[in-house]
């Protein structure tokens, strides 16, 4: 498949695709009522599916007694984005801060729905984060979010299941060895992993194979996507299709569903190839596996020590005319994403983005 379009067209198409159930009209700013409570405190609302973020609230409020923070889980990625789009379209009900993955951030920036945090001094943090995460939030000369986490890939596995199968994942380096390990795990009744058609996972694995199906024209504007003629894309597709054909991957259990968590919990799905942010999700979604999970390097096509990324997200501020709420929201974002104590509290069980 080959497709060529301008960057602007791609951004607009992507933005339109995210406008599920959103009316065609409405304000792009958050017109919620003043956030000042009866006690004179400024109240801010944060939407985030990150289970570690609420841990930071108590210490933040202690250090900032004039601010009250309410963290709400409005759903994971696309579920949250739909709710956010609906609120933005209606002109009310949007949060002050919202967790947005790096891939989705440009869509909200293009539509003018999030604040440039440079006005609060966020630009000075350019050397604090890894280059990749900083580049993901620095758009069109502005800083439109603060990085929360990053997603270098890792192989998380249930040691009990792999011990039963007689497989040591730390010695599995190539995709051929991964295939052999999958057969042994399947013989125990479990699947080595699951994949119900995750496009993000597909991207991550093709990048791991060395694929570069996306290219920018000499004009700096046109973008070409060519999947069918990239040999490295074929390397992954052929390998993964063989795994599926041989019933070595659970393709029926949807990722992030209750059944998926149940399968991780009981060992039916024995491992995951995913972002380094996964540990705290395992702790909350598969509590019976506590103490059983381990991590190994990603197996690669030829065993070389290369890696890819999967996911990663940021805290962005929804456009607002309320200066007090904006300043309070930025203080919390900086505390959670930059302050040493805030980061220490959040990254227990994860990998920071610096």
Ranges and model annotations:
Residues 102-153, 179, 205-207, 294-296:
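Hinge/lid segment of periplasmic solute-binding proteins
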Residues 2-106, 287, 302-303, 324-325, ...:
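Conserved N-terminal structural module of periplasmic/extracytoplasmic solute-binding proteins
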Residues 182-183, 222-253:
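Glycine-centered hinge/linker elements that transmit conformational signals in sensory
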Residues 238, 245-246, 285-352:
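Extracytoplasmic/periplasmic substrate-recognition and gating elements
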Residues 81-93, 111, 161-162, 180-187, ...:
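Short helices/loops that flank or line small-molecule/ion binding pockets
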Residues 73-83, 103, 173-179, 252-266:
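Short helix-initiation/N-cap motifs at beta->coil->alpha
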Residues 86, 94-96, 125-161, 191-192, ...:
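A structural signal for short loop-to-beta-strand junctions that line the ligand-binding cleft
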Residues 96-99, 270-275, 294:
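Paired acidic/hydrophobic, glycine-rich loop segments that form the ligand-binding mouth/hinge
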